[in-house]
């Protein structure tokens, strides 16, 4: 069984998130999503509209996602890859090159973002209403 992992905040879940998950799942048989905790988001100076538990619930209801694990810090990726026997690490290409160090442990793929939609843009649009 080929296992794939991706990470993200997945706040204000939208079409672009779904396309990322679909493309990630198409690369393997089992998809794990490392979901940023509220505490980790604060460390990154980000604030989610939805709580970790609500974002986790949304992801767990999506058939493409087999498992959701908490992302608590930047450093856990290597241990997650080893613990879950990951074959492929997938993330958006806005992170291109940032996770090349993981190639020692698994395949690393940077997927193109879906044009025209992002959580940041949704938040800006909502703020301007």
From Swiss-Prot:
Binding locations of CTP: 9-10, 14-17, 46, 113-120
Binding annotation for substrate: 44, 77
Signal peptide: none
Known catalytic reactions: sn-glycerol 3-phosphate + CTP + H(+) = CDP-glycerol + diphosphate
Domain of life, per lineage: Bacteria
A Pfam family annotated for this UniProt entry: CTP_transf_like
A single Gene Ontology CC term: cytoplasm
One GO biological process term: teichoic acid biosynthetic process
UniProt keyword Glycoprotein, yes or no: no
Pathway the protein contributes to: Cell wall biogenesis; poly(ribitol phosphate) teichoic acid biosynthesis
Family according to the record: Belongs to the cytidylyltransferase family.
Purpose: Catalyzes the transfer of the cytidylyl group of CTP to sn-glycerol 3-phosphate so the activated glycerol 3-phosphate can be used for teichoic acid synthesis, via incorporation into both the linkage unit by TarB and TarF.
Protein name: Glycerol-3-phosphate cytidylyltransferase
Source species of the chain: Bacillus spizizenii (strain ATCC 23059 / NRRL B-14472 / W23) (Bacillus subtilis subsp. spizizenii)
